[in-house]
Regions:
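Conserved class I S-adenosyl-L-methionine
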Residues: 75-86
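Conserved SAM-binding loop of SAM-dependent methyltransferases across substrates and taxa
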Residues: 87-101
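Conserved SAM-binding loop
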Residues: 117-118
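A short acidic, Gly/Pro-enriched loop at the edge of an enzyme's catalytic core
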Residues: 137-148
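Mobile active-site "lid"/loop adjacent to the S-adenosyl-L-methionine
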Residues: 150-180, 201
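Conserved Class I SAM-dependent methyltransferase catalytic core
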Residues: 173-230
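Flexible, glycine-/basic-rich loop-and-beta segments that form/coincide
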Residues: 236-284
């Protein structure tokens, strides 16, 4: 069945279980395991290049996302839904680096990637839940504090499913990343935050008028953090972190910040100070 839920790395394959047990005996720390997986996936990608939407979120961006969530939420416990969780690297980064008790659920349509993510979580010893499903289609999910996604970019092939969404195009296939943003907001608590890694030209690209129409009615764009272009294969593929909330009566002055580097400690420190000021309601 396509709706199988894999929790805590459970799987039917005995061989996988045996391999996982052997790996656990190496007794690495969680952070060491995560770095090992990232290294192996990078090496594998050099010999067998991954399609763009299967590549994992770069470590620096994942850690930046952790910082953002730490600043936005002061609570000790937090629920996170990741849409299009892929190999589970972003989720694993939250579970190993976030200084909170995390209830994490990753949703992914690709059964192979789900198996890989669940197996990795099992070996590292992470309490992670995964569900297989098309994140554009409605799912029975509880609302979360955080909905996060490194959005897959491209056209969504099923026009009938797309047509149920406000961002749907009547002229052509609808952008999948627009559909995921609209659907993702439905799983967000009223005071939660949706954090989307999306193309930098999101608000000016084709179909952007449809997206902006939906944004105006249903969401508040509270922050835009553009990422350094050198992180991406080309300037055209550059991405920005867009932070959204459900529409509310309280107007928030958006935080707009061009992040010039993720390697330069001074640049990062300045960004962190500015973001902290913004979250505390201080004029930047």
């Amino acid at each position: 069945s396509s709706d199988l839920i894999y929790l805590d790395g459970e799987t039917e394959l005995e061989k996988v279980k045996e391999n996982n047990q052997a790996l656990k005996r190496l007794a690495l720390r969680k952070e060491e395991w995560l770095k090992t997986y990232q290294f192996l996936l990078m090496k594998a990608g050099q010999t067998e290049p991954l399609q763009a939407n299967h590549q994992f979120t770069p470590d620096a961006i994942a850690l930046l996302s952790v910082f953002i969530v730490e600043e936005l939420f002061k609570e000790e416990e937090i629920t996170i839904l990741e849409m299009g969780s892929g190999m589970g690297i972003l989720g694993a980064t939250f579970l190993t680096s976030l200084d909170k008790k995390v209830d994490y659920l990753g949703m992914e349509v690709d059964d192979l990637l789900i198996d890989l993510a669940a197996s990795m979580a099992d070996v590292i010893g992470l309490q992670a839940g995964f569900v297989q499903g098309d994140a554009v289609r409605p799912q029975m999910l509880k609302e979360s504090d955080v909905v996060i996604s490194d959005l897959p970019v491209g056209y969504y092939p099923d026009d009938a499913v797309a047509s149920r969404h406000q961002v749907a195009s009547s002229q052509e296939h609808t952008y999948a990343h627009h559909l995921l943003m609209e659907q993702g907001l439905k799983y967000l608590k009223s005071d939660g935050y949706a954090i989307f890694l999306a193309p930098s030209d999101l608000l000016t690209s084709p179909q952007s008028d449809l997206l902006k129409g939906w944004l105006k009615e249903e969401a508040s764009l509270v922050a835009m953090i553009s990422l350094p272009e050198n992180l991406f294969a080309s300037a055209k593929q550059s991405k920005t972190i867009f932070i959204l909330q459900k529409k509310s009566e309280i107007a928030v002055e958006p935080f707009v910040y061009p992040l010039a580097s993720l390697q330069d400690a001074n640049v990062l420190m300045k960004f962190k100070e500015n973001f902290q000021k913004w979250t505390q309601g201080t004029e930047i």
